[in-house]
Amino acid sequence: MSDVYADWESVIGLEVHVELNTKSKLFSSAQNRFGDEPNTNISPVCTGMPGSLPVLNKEAVNKAILFACAVQGEVALLSRFDRKSYFYPDSPRNFQITQFEHPIVRGGYVKAIVRGEERYFELAQAHIEDDAGMLKHFGEFAGVDYNRAGVPLIEIVSKPCMFCADDAVAYATALVSLLDYIGISDCNMEEGSVRFDVNVSVRPKGSEELRNKVEIKNMNSFAFMAQALEAERCRQIEAYLENPNKDPKTVIPGATYRWDPEKKKTVLMRLKERAEDYKYFIEPDLPVLQLTEAYIDDIRKTLPELPYDKYQRYLREYALAEDIAAILISDKHIANFFELATKECKNYRALSNWVTVEFAGRCKTQGKNLAFSGILPSGVAQLVNFIDKGVITGKIAKDIADMMMESPDKSPEVILKENPEMLPMTDESALVAIISEVISANPQSVVDYKSGKTKALGFLVGQIMKRTQGKAPPNRVNEILLVELDK
């Protein structure tokens, strides 16, 4: 990257739209379910029929409160709804019901690790609103599916507290993990359950000025978010450098863009609307939402352990490496799998490696998640215990892991009973004979070892393990080999 670019920094804030996993929609009894036939989960309310009146979904309110508790936000005892007016085919009422002036949540923060450092990303607010329908294009015409119209959302608005793409991705990743842990959304980004609108501007480093921002709409991939932020950063910096004498306010107009992953560039959709353009006014068909501290406290008591707290506990209780702990807590189901396995295996570091590396790699190849593969936590724990006790070698353990993937209902113990030929070598005289043969076949390695080249020892061990098909106990191989070499 040009040194000139290094003199600039991004200023980034995110608006995250999260579909709540309620049974019904926000203001009607229509089902909230993804993937059904178009226009089957609809009602007069979500299709904007004359005379239909909204009724607020209590479950959606509870989930918004739970989110507030998870991020240490302030829950408003009094909040209200407003109409946001705009015309678009996927909005049959020509307005959205949202919370413009009095949101249910203010403040709070999300904790994340960025480049090895703990960061607190501050939130401005979170508010409840309903989703729009979906336009579906078919060649020369388009149809509208209103199944999504009226689905409850919380829109989580961060402060402009991120200054590079790494910050934004770390925040977004931590936020999605937190949402998944507290169970208020299925967090399926491919299905649009979580969508990111990214606001970004740039400024010279050291400046406190907030210049005109650009919004990049509807991102549902962390990788695309990082690419879009970097591309937009470069575009804006170049525009300012090409127009040094212009008022910065006129160089980058406020606008809405989308990310084109094929062209690797942001594409203009429209110039930015002002708040007045939406003609906000109080929703007349809904009363003020009133809550009590006791009601909020009851919901707060249902909070599970949050991902960052779990991460810290894994470092403290299990003495795991930071990167391994981060991988484990990134998926609550994998974290639960690991914790169940720790009840039967106390070699936590080895166990975490088998969960996050060995089995995770095998599962990825097959498009599976270990937590739903059918393999039991007790099976992985038993495998690690067998290695520690010398019942099997690491090489045999990997072969057993392959067989567990094929037959997830079988434990390592069962697999060994069915395949006794997999058991390690127990005939030490045979092992000594093989070691002697390897030494005789590799005289140069023996000379190298005796002249201080330690890599030669590793080569000889590798040859022995190869000859024994990985069945020789590694500790005994080393012990016997050293004795034979010293003769």
Swiss-Prot record:
Per the UniProt record, the source organism is Chlamydia felis (strain Fe/C-56)
> HAMAP family under this entry?
GatB
EC number(s)?
A: 6.3.5.-
Catalytic activity annotation:
L-glutamyl-tRNA(Gln) + L-glutamine + ATP + H2O = L-glutaminyl-tRNA(Gln) + L-glutamate + ADP + phosphate + H(+); L-aspartyl-tRNA(Asn) + L-glutamine + ATP + H2O = L-asparaginyl-tRNA(Asn) + L-glutamate + ADP + phosphate + 2 H(+)
Q: Which SMART domains match?
A: GatB_Yqey (SM00845)
Q: Which UniProt keywords apply?
A: ATP-binding, Ligase, Nucleotide-binding, Protein biosynthesis
UniProt entry tagged with the keyword Zinc: no
What InterPro entries does the entry give?
A: Asn/Gln-tRNA_amidoTrfase_suB/E (IPR017959), Asn/Gln-tRNA_Trfase_suB/E_cat (IPR006075), Asn/Gln_amidotransferase (IPR018027), Asn/Gln_tRNA_amidoTrase-B-like (IPR003789), GatB (IPR004413), GatB_C_1 (IPR042114), GatB_Yqey_C_2 (IPR023168), Gln-tRNA_amidoTrfase_suB_CS (IPR017958)
Role, per record: Allows the formation of correctly charged Asn-tRNA(Asn) or Gln-tRNA(Gln) through the transamidation of misacylated Asp-tRNA(Asn) or Glu-tRNA(Gln) in organisms which lack either or both of asparaginyl-tRNA or glutaminyl-tRNA synthetases. The reaction takes place in the presence of glutamine and ATP through an activated phospho-Asp-tRNA(Asn) or phospho-Glu-tRNA(Gln).
Gene name? gatB
Q: Which BP terms does GO give this entry? A: glutaminyl-tRNAGln biosynthesis via transamidation; translation
Family membership, please give it: Belongs to the GatB/GatE family. GatB subfamily.
Molecular function as annotated in GO: asparaginyl-tRNA synthase (glutamine-hydrolyzing) activity; ATP binding; glutaminyl-tRNA synthase (glutamine-hydrolyzing) activity
This protein is called what? Aspartyl/glutamyl-tRNA(Asn/Gln) amidotransferase subunit B
User: What domain of life?
Assistant: Bacteria
Quaternary structure? Heterotrimer of A, B and C subunits.
Q: What class of enzyme is it?
A: ligase
